[in-house]
Amino acid sequence: MTRTAKLLLVPILLLQILFFIFMALHRFIDGDEGFYLLASKLVLMHKKPYLDFLYEQAPLLPYVYALWMKYFGISWNSARIFSALLTTLLGTLLYEHVCRQTRNWLAGLAAAVLFASSTLVFAWFPVVKVYSLAELFLFAAYVAISRLSSTSPRWLMGASGLLLGLSVDTASYLLLLIPVFLWWIFRNSDAGARRPSILWFLGGFTIAMVPCLYLFISSPDAFVFSNVGYQAIRTNAGLMGMWSEKFIVVLMLFIGGPPGNGIQNSILFFIALGFIFSIRRPRYPPRFAFQIAVIVAVISLLPTPAQQQRLCLCVPFLVVSAVCVVNDLFVTLESRRQRLLAAAACVCLLGIYLAGSANDLRKYLITGDGIPGVRWAHDKDDWRLRRVLEVSQAIDRVASPGEMVASFWSGYIFQTKAVPSLGFEADYGLAIAEKLTLQQRVRYHVLSPAEVESNFAAHVPRIVVVGNQYSLGDRMRYTAETSLRAHGYTLVRSIGDTSIYVYYSKP
């Protein structure tokens, strides 16, 4: 890195911290954040994913967030600030890598701006989901392996394997990237160093897989169901179906749609695609970054249903490939006129890119239009952090410390003194319950609607919270509230579109 690049490192770090923490504290809540946070709280209570509660992802995230919350508080603000810090670390690593690759601080600055202003980044990384943690590990693995040379230490490949393994521990579908990394090592290592480099890489990856291996050995069936089986049955199309939907998601990625604009993704992708293969330099990391971006996009689209938000994992790699290739082509221009025209074109594209995110910022911070889950809500303020905390405080007023509460959305229980009723640890279990046998439901910690009805009839638990069950729909809400009233539960508080029911035993 040049001296100027090093001087800019701290300001870029601080500006990202301010921006991403602002986004984390003011963005509408995503529905999945509830069960990720509750899973992290359960880990703090010495419970294990798969073995003690339903958890439909690789297991690392709840452990990492639990460790953070152990020291910085069990709260929405604490967890979201942690996500913002992870995103900041990712953006800073991106800046450092581009500066090192191009030896140009201006290219690094452009990369940081493109990263932070991408809708897919500011909308999905600073929230409590797998994206920021998995991407930080994945991008760090890429940075480590991109520095492979005849003089690089062997442990660097071990570190890359370890980091890739940690990303797989967070989002299991990234396992499919292993062949891509192995191919890069094979193609770019000296003949005598290929085998040791690959072994070091695989050794690091194996070490990272130890937690997953432990949980798999403890309950192979529950582990496989949570990471693969759930995705296969959550829709009627199977694990990798609904191809027309995937095509629409790809189309919206480039032309725009309700979740965000398409111009930013089009600029990054087509600039990289148009020029990346014109640079014949061997061991060219930006080309590897582009390959990772494309393969991650394909992998992310495979599970059903396809979700555009998963493609946020491609953005840092597209930024690297686009910025580096433009910089490398720019330095080959000989005349001053050519350089001025190229610089003007870059400034123009940057302006268009930044303008593309203006309306999306308004969506995710103010209106909620087009945001998954929020746009269908009867009261969009139910997905504001202040409203969720208001409901949690109301629960604490009627529940004793440690009392079990059934909430149809996990997020309401997280920042309370209560604990989730058995089977309500994950709010999406009810949606798939009728596709499972009784034995499977017991093994995976899932309740069926009939079992929920039976529990309400027995007045178990005493407190039930109905609201924000976006994955279940209005019909489930109507059924639940009808059952609660029929079995003597009393509505004690309504906050927005959320209701708290309590059963008071008769003397």
Positions of PLM-derived features:
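Short helix- or helix-capping micro-motifs
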Residues: Q16, G108-S117, V143, L164, ...
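Membrane-interface alpha helices of multi-pass inner-membrane proteins
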Residues: A111-A112, W155-S172, I178-F181, T206-I207, ...
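Hydrophobic, aromatic-rich transmembrane alpha-helices
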Residues: R3, T92, G256-F290, V294-A297
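Hydrophobic/aromatic-rich transmembrane helices and adjacent perimembrane loops
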Residues: Y131-A134, L176, A297-R337
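Membrane-interface transmembrane helices that cradle and orient dolichyl/undecaprenyl
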Residues: C99-T102, F139-A159, F186-A191, F269-P285, ...
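Membrane-lumen/periplasm interface segments of specific transmembrane helices
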Residues: F19, I198-L239, L302, I352-D360
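Transmembrane-helix signature of polytopic, membrane-embedded enzymes
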Residues: K6, L89-S117, E135-L136, W155, ...
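Extracytoplasmic
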Residues: Q57, L174, L350-K506
